[in-house]
Amino acid sequence: MPNTAKKHREALAKIDRSRTYPLVEGIESVKSAAYAKFDETVEVAVRLGVDPRHADQMVRGAVVLPNGLGKDVRVLVFAKGEKEKEAREAGADYVGAEDLVTKIQEGWFEFDTAIATPDMMGVVGKIGKLLGPRGLMPNPKVGTVTFDVGRAVKESKAGKVEFRVEKAGIVHAPVGKVSFDADKLKENLLALVEALLKAKPSAAKGTYVKKISISSTMGPGLNLDISDVQAKLV
């Protein structure tokens, strides 16, 4: 524990919390400050000028990160017949229907994302209270309720990230691992920001993107220069 505390202090010393960092410098600083023995996830927090208590200011969506997440995503699909076959051929880890519902009711959650064909939602609805709080409930707004299960599976495997604004108006999302080079993390972060801009509610007034911060799982966070980030969007 003392050794961990020392490493954290050393990591904090590498970050100037009083300034905002240009995008690339910020990413490189987060990479250099990471100290855990495992490959830490690089996480982004974006504070938006919305009040999610109002339905017309909810921000929700998904984006396929161009360089993936650096981890194996376990995909579960609720489907039958030809769609079951399509899901398996696309690389889904688990495919089924009522049998999977039973396993989940018994406490099994060994998967990272769930996809369902629309005709299966009546079955999936039985476990909505189990999947919902874990962020695993299939939803048409993020493309996980669809008949195009092959595409949905491939996107999830490739590094699809779902995002949803929280009560404080903040969106949290992973953009890769500290082992990624800075350019790959930059491309992933820009893809996320672009998706957030596209998801801007028409009811949102004033400044939309108020703050962007980045950190690793164990390391300290820092604030990015919003104007520099937006200038790099294609």
Curated annotation (Swiss-Prot):
Origin superkingdom: Bacteria
Annotated InterPro entries: Ribosom_uL1_bac-type, Ribosomal_uL1, Ribosomal_uL1-like, Ribosomal_uL1/biogenesis, Ribosomal_uL1_3-a/b-sand, Ribosomal_uL1_CS
Keyword rRNA processing among UniProt keywords: no
Assigned keywords, A-Z: Repressor, Ribonucleoprotein, Ribosomal protein, RNA-binding, rRNA-binding, Translation regulation, tRNA-binding
Any GO CC annotation of this UniProt entry: cytosolic large ribosomal subunit
SUPFAM superfamilies according to UniProt: Ribosomal protein L1
Membership in a protein family: Belongs to the universal ribosomal protein uL1 family.
Keyword Magnesium carried by entry: no
PROSITE patterns with a match to the protein in the record: RIBOSOMAL_L1
GO molecular function: rRNA binding; structural constituent of ribosome; tRNA binding
Coiled-coil portions: none
Species, as recorded: Geobacter sulfurreducens (strain ATCC 51573 / DSM 12127 / PCA)
Protein name: Large ribosomal subunit protein uL1
GO process annotations (BP): regulation of translation; translation
Pfam entry (one): Ribosomal_L1
Known role: Binds directly to 23S rRNA. The L1 stalk is quite mobile in the ribosome, and is involved in E site tRNA release.
Cysteine disulfide partners in this protein: none
Assembly description: Part of the 50S ribosomal subunit.
Gene3D superfamilies: 3.30.190.20, 3.40.50.790
